Amino acid sequence: MAGHSQFKNIMYRKGAQDKKRSKLFAKLAKEITVAAKMGLPDPEYNPRLRAAIQAARVENMPKDNIERAIKKSSDQGGENYEEVRYEGFGPGGIGVIVETLTDNRNRTAGEVRSIFTKNGGNLGETGAVSFMFDRLGLIEYPADAASADDMIEAAIEAGADDCQSGEAGHELYCAPDALHEVAQGLESKFGEARAARIVWKPQNTIALEDEKAETVLKMLEALDDNDDVQQVYANFEMSDSLMEKMSA
């Protein structure tokens, strides 16, 4: 997924996932709670909750934490989170989409705007950059789950629109409202996916060089580090050699 995947890979290689594990768990728990509150607390009948639990398992979140997050959805008087999307431009003119879960719109808007401004970006209005992305369902499997040929054959049969395979794994795309059905079809053949969620996929990407790439990654890391931010998407790409350098 271009910028989104490259940024996550760099953070993982730098060890940021371990250093911020408690913060990561808090974000995963928040999504589980919101998903359970918006639908049934049973993942079998709640696709969003099922996806949230899958994401938590991938990060080795303890089962007790997951169960507490689900139980919290029924607590009376707890926080009421709302989903708010922010869009803007980062260094080099890249488009950035920030998805948040917040209990205070004013606080979150101020913090997100500050991060954009401090890093040479510009927060825009809703719709400012989303037209440069496609809203799609994404299902991910590790590379050893199947061969590229077997995966694409199963993807077509399950109703996916696109399948991209490489050393990092398999990425299958479908219409957002078909995500649950496609994921179930693939699960019957390859087992539970590594992830199944709705994403923003850039239609085109902007290639970044050394200095600009460093500035962009600094901004994305600051956004990702914010407690209210759940996901960050950007339409950039960088060479493998530059990615290795940024990961050091």
Swiss-Prot record:
It is found in: Cytoplasm. One of its GO terms (biological process) is regulation of DNA-templated transcription. InterPro entries: Integrase-like_N, TACO1_YebC-like_2nd/3rd_dom, TACO1_YebC_N, Transcrip_reg_TACO1-like, Transcrip_reg_TACO1-like_dom3, YebC-like. Its main location: cytoplasm. Keywords: Cytoplasm, DNA-binding, Transcription, Transcription regulation. One of its GO terms (cellular component) is cytosol. It holds the Pfam family TACO1_YebC_N. The keyword RNA-binding does not apply. It comes from the Bacteria. One of its GO terms (molecular function) is DNA binding. The keyword Chaperone does not apply. Belongs to the TACO1 family. This is Probable transcriptional regulatory protein Plav_2114. It comes from Parvibaculum lavamentivorans (strain DS-1 / DSM 13023 / NCIMB 13966). The lineage of its organism: Bacteria, Pseudomonadati, Pseudomonadota, Alphaproteobacteria, Hyphomicrobiales.
